């Protein structure tokens, strides 16, 4: 293991060796190869980064907004130039196929593009006359030092929800990437620095509990953005809020897809396969449950099973591979346990992904469990793997009632050509992001990622205008200017 590279933290524009004696292996989930080791940094290192970020904020927040935007535009151009390299890094440490990784890089670039619109986004508003000789104006100011806690499943897209917008609006930032996928962040830091970002404005501290707690407790840090599981998200929200921080926590999901009798069969099957099994099901917008009307159920499920059985599984760097590995061996074992729990509770296993025939890596094949009911563990829990539950329903109303029983409410989709059904779905479903005749309704950067219920803790979501509000304070100035002496 002596030749395995140990990653360093990025503080004050320099790569700094961690003071910790604890390191974790970063593993290629498709092969088991150790790619590098990541430090489990100390609380003191996080606190040091906070001091540096606070000092950098004092200068960066005073930089003219158009100049800050130019740095973001430069960063965006460098990301485009290095798109293929970034995609390969994602596949190497995360496992998703190269096509999906390229798509993730593109979404990250789009988030940087949106953030580069800071001169417009920072604009306030005003009213010239609120009373005699009195006017009022509303100004935006950055909140200060911001902390971000990012997950493994989208190592580029999710951090790019966070730090580009926060920094473009004048804040400084400390990011804790996932310890499972840290390599990509090295490259992003390099490119952001090359684009002209001053030292100390963006800092990266790898770690686990101590670093998370530092972000939540350090008084210098004024706001925290989190994406991850529900239990951790609840902890982040409660702890950060108790320490008087502004917090947004995007958490778990159990997304339902409704298939009505008039759905286009081929198109629906293609979309459901991609939504359920793409990225190995490790995404908070994955299709986890299909509720299908009885009239189309037999034909739809036969086609769905056939398509699932024909999915190519393997290393995401190999040509033609659709489904890569889950992130770790423990995730693989956990997924298999869920499948077996579903069988034990009465679900019918019609496509079995427990055995893939691959000798290396942490793979689970496409899995379909039918005759699922809402009292089953596999319906209730977020499995975060390529496992799809199927429920037959009599009509749209029943499908909506089933979906609305879930504690999660991130996304939901419907496949139909009936305008009335679409309107009913839109009005009655409890979810923040809806798809009509598409499988993954993740919004573009200029719309909020708007989960409901246990899928989100906070008030202001990531992305869109919400993110501008999250990363800025508002200051309303009311002024009296008498025109006495200027009478005509």
Swiss-Prot record:
InterPro entries in the record: Ald_DH/histidinol_DH, Ald_DH_C, Ald_DH_CS_CYS, Ald_DH_N, Aldehyde_DH_dom, MeMal-semiAld_DH, MSDH_GmP_bac
Enzyme class: oxidoreductase
Positions of NAD(+) binding: 150, 152, 176, 179-180, 229, 251, 382
Keywords annotated in UniProt: NAD, Oxidoreductase
EC number, as in UniProt: 1.2.1.27
Catalytic activity: 3-oxopropanoate + NAD(+) + CoA + H2O = hydrogencarbonate + acetyl-CoA + NADH + H(+); 2-methyl-3-oxopropanoate + NAD(+) + CoA + H2O = propanoyl-CoA + hydrogencarbonate + NADH + H(+)
Listed GO MF terms: malonate-semialdehyde dehydrogenase (acetylating) activity; methylmalonate-semialdehyde dehydrogenase (acylating, NAD) activity
Pathway membership, UniProt: Polyol metabolism; myo-inositol degradation into acetyl-CoA; acetyl-CoA from myo-inositol: step 7/7
Taxonomy, superkingdom: Bacteria
Record-annotated active site: 284 (nucleophile)
A GO BP annotation: valine catabolic process
Pfam family, one: Aldedh
Role according to the record: Catalyzes the oxidation of malonate semialdehyde (MSA) and methylmalonate semialdehyde (MMSA) into acetyl-CoA and propanoyl-CoA, respectively. Is involved in a myo-inositol catabolic pathway. Bicarbonate, and not CO2, is the end-product of the enzymatic reaction.
Quaternary context: Homotetramer.
Record-stated family: Belongs to the aldehyde dehydrogenase family. IolA subfamily.
Family matches, as NCBIfam families: MMSDH
Descriptive protein name: Malonate-semialdehyde dehydrogenase
């Amino acid at each position: 293991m002596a030749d395995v590279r140990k990653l360093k933290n990025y503080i004050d524009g320099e790569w700094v060796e961690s003071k910790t004696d604890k390191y974790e292996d970063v593993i290629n989930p498709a092969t088991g190869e150790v790619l590098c080791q990541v430090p489990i940094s100390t609380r003191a290192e996080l606190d040091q980064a906070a001091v540096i970020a606070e000092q950098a904020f004092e200068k960066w927040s005073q930089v003219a907004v158009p100049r800050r935007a130019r740095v973001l535009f430069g960063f965006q151009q460098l990301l485009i130039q290095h798109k293929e390299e970034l995609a390969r890094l994602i596949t190497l440490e995360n496992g998703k196929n190269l096509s999906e990784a390229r798509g993730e890089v593109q979404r990250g670039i789009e988030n940087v593009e949106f953030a580069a619109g800071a001169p417009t986004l920072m604009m306030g508003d005003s009213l010239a006359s609120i009373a005699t000789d009195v006017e009022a104006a509303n100004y935006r100011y950055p909140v200060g030092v911001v902390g971000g806690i990012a997950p493994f499943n989208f190592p580029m897209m999710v951090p790019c929800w966070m730090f580009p917008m926060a920094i473009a609006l004048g804040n400084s930032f400390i990011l804790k990437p996932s310890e499972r996928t840290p390599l990509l962040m090295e490259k992003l830091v390099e490119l952001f620095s090359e684009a002209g970002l001053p030292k100390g404005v963006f800092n990266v501290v790898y770690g686990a509990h101590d670093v998370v707690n530092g972000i939540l407790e350090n008084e210098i840090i004024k706001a925290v953005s989190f994406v991850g599981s529900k239990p951790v998200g609840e902890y982040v929200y409660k702890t950060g809020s108790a320490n008087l921080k502004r917090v947004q926590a995007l958490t778990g999901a159990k997304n339902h897809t409704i298939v009505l009798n008039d759905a286009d069969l081929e198109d629906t099957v293609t979309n459901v396969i991609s939504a359920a099994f793409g990225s190995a099901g490790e995404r908070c917008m994955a299709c986890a449950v299909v509720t299908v009307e009885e009239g189309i159920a037999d034909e739809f499920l036969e086609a769905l099973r056939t398509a699932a059985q024909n999915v190519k599984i393997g290393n995401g760097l190999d040509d033609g591979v659709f489904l890569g590995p889950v992130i770790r061996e423990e995730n693989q074992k956990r997924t298999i346990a869920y499948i077996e729990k579903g069988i034990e509770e009465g679900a019918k296993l019609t496509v079995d992904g427990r055995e893939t025939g691959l000798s290396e890596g942490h793979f689970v094949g496409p899995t379909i469990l039918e005759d699922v009911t809402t009292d089953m563990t596999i319906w209730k829990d977020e499995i975060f793997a390529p496992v799809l539950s199927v429920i037959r329903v009599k009509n749209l109303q029943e499908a909506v009632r089933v979906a609305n029983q879930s504690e999660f409410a991130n996304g939901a989709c419907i496949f139909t050509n009936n305008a009335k059904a679409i309107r009913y779905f839109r009005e009655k479903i409890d979810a923040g992001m809806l798809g009509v005749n598409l499988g993954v309704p993740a919004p573009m950067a200029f719309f909020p990622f708007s989960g409901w219920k246990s899928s989100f803790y906070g008030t202001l979501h990531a992305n869109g205008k919400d993110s501008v509000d999250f990363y800025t304070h508002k200051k309303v100035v009311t002024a009296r200017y008498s025109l006495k002496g200027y009478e005509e």
